[in-house]
Amino acid sequence: MALRFLGIDPNTGDQGSPTVWLDDETGDLVIQSYKADAATLAACAEVGSVPGHSTDVPEHETVVRLPGYMLQFFPKP
């Protein structure tokens, strides 16, 4: 895996904070951010996605909350 650092929360201290990397081999974004709280998970389940798709988050997935200002680090197509 060839990750390339894209950006970190500019207001970060020396503890964990939102960070974005790009996997140059797959084009995937790898994101470190805040765990979604129970209210956010419930809202995701209520809104859903496509008809008939489960609203449960499988064990191999998670939901994170990325602050909007971190979008500045996402590559433009």
Predicted regions and their residues:
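A residue-level signal for beta-strand positions that form part of recognition/binding surfaces
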Residues: 3, 28, 63
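Helix-rich interaction surfaces within compact, conserved domain-sized segments
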Residues: 42-77
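A short, structured beta-strand/loop element
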Residues: 14-56
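Generic secondary-structure microfeatures
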Residues: 7-10, 24, 33-35, 68-70
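Short, charged/polar N-terminal "headpieces" of proteins
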Residues: 1-18
